[in-house]
Regions:
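Beta-strand-centric surfaces of beta-sandwich/beta-rich domains
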Residues: 31-380
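N-terminal export signals
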Residues: 5-25
Length: 380
């Protein structure tokens, strides 16, 4: 498959997976990536483009038992499914009870913290380490353990459901697991993963990775977002933050510091503030907003809580050997107060094995000082 066919058949699904080629390899008049508007007539006509692919769906629905879900008991790790072949995941959707009152089971326990203690893992091509090892809430946009419906280009929470549309290529296989680390709640998951099988994939094409970080911070320590080695690019992140004191938002003073390849001692890219990186300003003075490539689903100043996301396409941060991304507050330590955070960084790398830091304990995952109850009457 040549580069022009790649743009026609795959770019509109998110060309974020394509690792960079040299300028000389680029067809004349064609741009790499996808800025949200067509780069060529082929991009504009993508919905009408006929492609030789086999569409399938991995689902928790069991036709023989007429059961829609797979149970995930507390303390258990369950394989949702494994697929052999070559292709890419085009859409990932799931939902599960436990974080809201269940009208069909009114005495069932409810705890929004299960959005932190239910862990999603994805393995590519027989790799030993998962490329994705992230709490479900953090991965889809509900890392504050509050669910506020929003839809970005690649992920979101939609009125009780959780979806992801990052293109996720695989050459031989993929496997999806869920682990329930909650001390009290059993749950069951509804899941549909639509994937396309193909005899050929465009090259060079990276494997999708999601790195999770979390900590309680006394104030001046850097907020680590991502660190990876090899060739690839950084494609964006979700970041959730909360001050220990109410009305404290000065953690937003920390600009991004991005270290790339030979620029390891001093950052290659430095910003002007944390909210500036997410393309807002003045501590997001107008409150929450939603866009395809950046947004703030939650800003609760009284609770000192902010949920933010940004997606990179044509502005992806490329690297050949390594990358490190952190937010670093320039204020003197005496001006800073404690806060906590959790984050998910999205990358495409030239290897399928995960490189993220090991997941902390369930107790450490529950980093928030306060969880706001967002449950409400919900009877169809």
């Amino acid at each position: 498959m040549d580069r022009r066919e790649f743009v026609a058949s795959f770019a509109a699904l998110g060309a974020t997976a394509a690792l960079p080629t040299t300028a000389s390899a680029q067809p004349e008049g064609q741009t790499s990536g996808n800025s949200g508007s067509p780069a060529s007539p082929a991009d504009a006509l993508w919905p009408a483009t006929l492609r030789k692919e086999t569409t399938r769906q991995l689902t928790t629905f069991n036709l023989s038992r007429k059961s829609k879900t797979i149970p995930i008991p507390r303390g258990k790790r369950v394989t949702i499914g494994e697929v052999k072949g070559q292709g890419y995941i085009a859409q990932f959707w799931l939902t599960f009870p436990g974080w809201f009152w269940q009208h069909w089971n009114p005495t069932a326990p409810v705890n929004q913290s299960i959005l932190k203690t239910l862990i999603l893992r994805i393995y590519w091509d027989g790799a030993d380490q998962p490329a994705v090892a992230v709490p479900v809430g953090d991965f889809f946009g509900a890392g504050l353990c509050e669910v506020a419906s929003f839809a970005s280009r690649y992920f979101g929470t939609s009125s009780g459901g959780f979806f992801c549309k990052w293109p996720m290529p695989f050459r031989k296989s993929f496997r999806v697991e869920l682990e329930n680390l909650d001390a009290e709640l059993n749950t069951e998951v509804f899941c549909n993963i639509l994937y396309q099988l193909s005899d050929s994939l465009p090259e060079p094409l990276g494997w999708f990775h999601a790195q999770f970080n979390t900590a309680q911070n006394k104030g001046p320590a850097p907020v680590q977002i991502a660190e990876a080695r090899g060739r690839g690019h950084y494609a964006g992140c979700l970041l959730y933050m909360q001050g220990q004191e109410r009305n404290y938002l000065s953690f937003l003073e920390a600009p991004e510091h991005v270290y790339v390849d030979a620029d390891w001692e001093a950052p290659r890219i430095v910003g002007t503030g944390l909210e500036d990186y997410f393309l807002g300003g003045w501590y997001f003075r107008e409150g929450s907003f939603i866009g395809p490539y950046h947004g703030v689903p939650i800003k609760d100043a009284l609770n000192a809580s902010v949920a933010m996301y940004r997606v990179h396409e044509t502005d992806a941060i490329r690297f050949e050997q390594r990358i490190k991304f952190a937010f670093v507050n320039p204020w003197s330590p005496d001006r800073l107060k404690p806060f906590c955070f959790s984050s998910v960084a999205f990358l495409y790398l030239d290897k399928p094995d995960g490189q993220g830091t090991p997941l902390p304990s369930a107790k450490e995952l529950l980093c928030w000082y306060r969880i706001r109850n967002t449950d409400h009457q919900s009877i169809p």
